[in-house]
Amino acid sequence: MLSKDLLEALNDQMNHEYFAAHAYMAMAAYCDDASYEGFANFYIQQAKEERFHGKKIYDYINDRGEHAEFKSIPAPKTEFKSILETFKDGLAQEQDVTRRFYNLSEIAQKDKDYATISFLNWFLDEQVEEESTFETHIDYLNRIGDDCNTLYLYEKELAARSFDEE
């Protein structure tokens, strides 16, 4: 049985994962509108990954005999000035998610809920990868600058990205 605080935090995080999926779809829409289909694909795959994370938390809550509680998801930001801005926003979002998982881990440790600590370790490892991915893209976009040919090639590389549930 999960403590009240831990269940509430897990439900909040599950809902936040679905919000993150919406935010990435808004970034995909911006990219599609700007005719950057490769970048749009990157964000569509990110959204799939966030929905997978939400479902993983949903399953865990249910496996622990508790009730997953869905809440209203606020509308994400939909206006961006550049592709680089979408990646900076994505990094900030992932950093926020990392902080949220640290908080969840602290609650689980306080509760001595070792099963949840083990469950959350997967997400903590995942967040290292997520932040690194966004930092790499930001660095690369900064290096590309206004070089349209290199940006075109980079975008084509991202068009091939796909998400497979682990």
UniProtKB/Swiss-Prot annotation:
<comment type="similarity">
    <text>Belongs to the ferritin family. Prokaryotic subfamily.</text>
</comment>
<dbReference type="GO" id="GO:0004322">
    <property type="term" value="F:ferroxidase activity"/>
</dbReference>
<dbReference type="Pfam" id="PF00210">
    <property type="entry name" value="Ferritin"/>
</dbReference>
<keyword id="KW-0409">Iron storage</keyword>
<dbReference type="InterPro" id="IPR009040">
    <property type="entry name" value="Ferritin-like_diiron"/>
</dbReference>
<keyword id="KW-0408">Iron</keyword>
<feature type="binding site">
    <location>
        <position position="50"/>
    </location>
    <ligand>
        <name>Fe cation 2</name>
    </ligand>
</feature>
<feature type="binding site">
    <location>
        <position position="53"/>
    </location>
    <ligand>
        <name>Fe cation 1</name>
    </ligand>
</feature>
<feature type="binding site">
    <location>
        <position position="17"/>
    </location>
    <ligand>
        <name>Fe cation 1</name>
    </ligand>
</feature>
<feature type="binding site">
    <location>
        <position position="94"/>
    </location>
    <ligand>
        <name>Fe cation 2</name>
    </ligand>
</feature>
<protein>
    <recommendedName>
        <fullName>Bacterial non-heme ferritin</fullName>
        <ecNumber>1.16.3.2</ecNumber>
    </recommendedName>
</protein>
<dbReference type="GO" id="GO:0006879">
    <property type="term" value="P:intracellular iron ion homeostasis"/>
</dbReference>
<feature type="domain" description="Ferritin-like diiron">
    <location>
        <begin position="2"/>
        <end position="145"/>
    </location>
</feature>
<dbReference type="InterPro" id="IPR041719">
    <property type="entry name" value="Ferritin_prok"/>
</dbReference>
<dbReference type="GO" id="GO:0006826">
    <property type="term" value="P:iron ion transport"/>
</dbReference>
<dbReference type="GO" id="GO:0008198">
    <property type="term" value="F:ferrous iron binding"/>
</dbReference>
<dbReference type="InterPro" id="IPR001519">
    <property type="entry name" value="Ferritin"/>
</dbReference>
<dbReference type="GO" id="GO:0008199">
    <property type="term" value="F:ferric iron binding"/>
</dbReference>
<dbReference type="GO" id="GO:0005829">
    <property type="term" value="C:cytosol"/>
</dbReference>
<feature type="binding site">
    <location>
        <position position="50"/>
    </location>
    <ligand>
        <name>Fe cation 1</name>
    </ligand>
</feature>
<dbReference type="InterPro" id="IPR012347">
    <property type="entry name" value="Ferritin-like"/>
</dbReference>
<feature type="binding site">
    <location>
        <position position="127"/>
    </location>
    <ligand>
        <name>Fe cation 2</name>
    </ligand>
</feature>
<keyword id="KW-0963">Cytoplasm</keyword>
<keyword id="KW-0560">Oxidoreductase</keyword>
<comment type="function">
    <text>Iron-storage protein.</text>
</comment>
<dbReference type="InterPro" id="IPR008331">
    <property type="entry name" value="Ferritin_DPS_dom"/>
</dbReference>
<dbReference type="InterPro" id="IPR009078">
    <property type="entry name" value="Ferritin-like_SF"/>
</dbReference>
<keyword id="KW-0479">Metal-binding</keyword>
